[in-house]
Amino acid sequence: MKKWVLSALLLLLLVACGENGQVNEEQESNAVDSQTEENESTEDAEEEDVPASTNEEPAENEEYEEKQTEEDTGTIDKEETDSELKEPQYIVNESNWALEPISDANPEVVLLTIDDAPDRYALEMAAILKELNVKAIFFVNGHFLETEEEQNALKEIHAMGFPIGNHTMTHKSLRQLSEEEQYEEIVLLSDKVEEIIGERPRFFRAPFGTNTDYAQELVKQEGMILMNWTYGFDWETEYMDAEALANVMVNTEYLSSGSNLLMHDREWTKDALADIVKGLQAKNYEILDPDLIGTDEAASELE
């Protein structure tokens, strides 16, 4: 009897232990599953919290930085190029009105200038020079800028790349005018030119080459370069012929390094222009780009 009771108690004890082990295993399994689900849920939540564009931002930033770098580099290059283009290489010698190199610039140059524009032939003359790939200064008068046609001609000349000079409003001798009248002749023309082409003239030439102290100071205040000429012939009767004019302009004894050639808006000058340019080039003279002419102050800064 005792054996049977002990056996029954032992059996009950074993059953109880087995159930507890199963419960513990289930609890542990549930705990592990719960932790796994919690971790997966946490990871999912972290992935959802990160914006979808995050992975794209570095690429966008790199693209932006690359673009910005290219733009910055382009700006610097452009500024350096503009600076180089604007750096003067020649000045006007006011004792003889020739062009002088500032440092190691080519001394064998001549400057072409055309006065009294745009009367009748200036636009054609500009087209001829453009075709020959050379430049000249077109000195304009206010009384040739009164009509829309004349103003459009000036716009076209400027658009072709030719610098514009101030030759006064009405071509009167400055020495016969009061200071107030001189001011009007000079400044009002610069105002008019700016109104037409968007910029003021860089050069000034007085009618008949006669300046006054007041006019010279005013020109300086206006930031213009004072200029006369070294030689010219097209107003003389014997040279009012294209062939004769071309011959004297190229073969005169006055031609030398830095010569400042004066011509006018005239039919015979227009017809002689190509031969003048080619004749000068045949003598190994370079036609000077007026954009390379600076002031004495600019030259001093470079020294």
Go through the PLM ranges and name each one.
Residues K172-I197, F208-S256:
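Alpha-helical scaffold elements lining the catalytic groove of polysaccharide deacetylases
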Residues A126, L154-K155, I186-S190, L273-V277:
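Generic structural signal for well-ordered alpha-helices
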Residues V110-T113, A136-V140, P163-N166, R202-R205, ...:
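Structural recognition of the beta-strand scaffold that forms the well-ordered cores
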Residues M1-W4:
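Positively charged n-region of N-terminal signal peptides that target proteins for export
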Residues K78-S173, K192:
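Active-site beta->alpha N-cap acidic-glycine motif
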Residues L6, L11, G18-P107:
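N-terminal, intrinsically disordered, polar/charged segments of Gram-positive cell-envelope systems
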Residues D116-R120, N141-E149, S173-L177, R205-N211, ...:
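Acidic-and-aromatic substrate-binding clefts and catalytic sites of carbohydrate-active enzymes
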Residues P101, E146, T269-E303:
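C-terminal domain-boundary segment and adjacent tail
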